[in-house]
Curated annotation (Swiss-Prot):
Segments crossing the lipid bilayer: none
Top-level taxon of origin: Bacteria
Protein name (database record): Ribosome maturation factor RimM
Record-annotated PRC barrel domain positions: 96-170
Pfam families according to UniProt: PRC (PF05239), RimM (PF01782)
Localization per Swiss-Prot or TrEMBL: Cytoplasm
């Protein structure tokens, strides 16, 4: 059985030439949305997958704008609003050591180097120079942890466990 990964959500159309506006959920939008790549649009029930070939990709504000082969006007892509864009597991490439896919990190438990449980990673933000991991704490506000070597000491994907060093002012 094929395992599918969500790489974006189609939130609207853009213009009249069949461009769609996507909120990206992929770690590598330039690679994932490269012209010629095949993506799959899934329905709400996640039971049917429509293969589409990317014919253009550009970034606009906080969105990725895509066009697909054979879909040349707004009327043809209107039906995709609200759909998810997915890729099968075999389209995920191998990563270098110390690099992880978002889906591998989200859901990991986070502990300090002293063993204190802080919470679970619920989201990854990419505001600039480095990613920021959002940790849902059992009580209180979410905690924001920069993904830098001085803070993230160890990532154990098999055990879904991340060990961090708490720098002054982080908590």
């Amino acid at each position: 059985m094929t395992k599918w990964f969500n790489v974006g959500k189609i939130v609207n159309t853009h213009g009249v030439r069949g461009e769609i506006r996507v909120i990206s959920r992929t770690d590598f939008p330039e690679e994932r949305y490269k012209v010629g790549n095949t993506l799959y649009i899934s329905n709400e029930k996640d039971t049917d997958y429509l293969p589409v070939k990317v014919t253009s990709h550009r970034q606009h504000k906080t969105f990725d704008l895509l066009t697909f082969e054979g879909y040349n006007n707004v009327d043809e892509v209107e039906k995709f609003k609200g759909s998810l864009i997915k890729v099968p597991e075999e389209q995920l490439g191998e990563l270098a050591e110390g690099e992880y896919y978002y889906h591998e990190i989200i859901g990991c438990s986070v502990v300090t180097e002293e063993g204190e449980a802080l919470g679970t990673i619920k989201e990854i933000l990419s505001p600039g120079a480095n990613d920021v991991w959002v940790i849902k704490r059992p009580k209180g506000q979410d905690l924001l942890i920069p993904y830098i070597d001085d803070v993230v000491l160890q990532v154990n994907i098999e055990n879904k466990l991340v060990t961090i060093h708490v720098m002054e002012g982080l908590l």
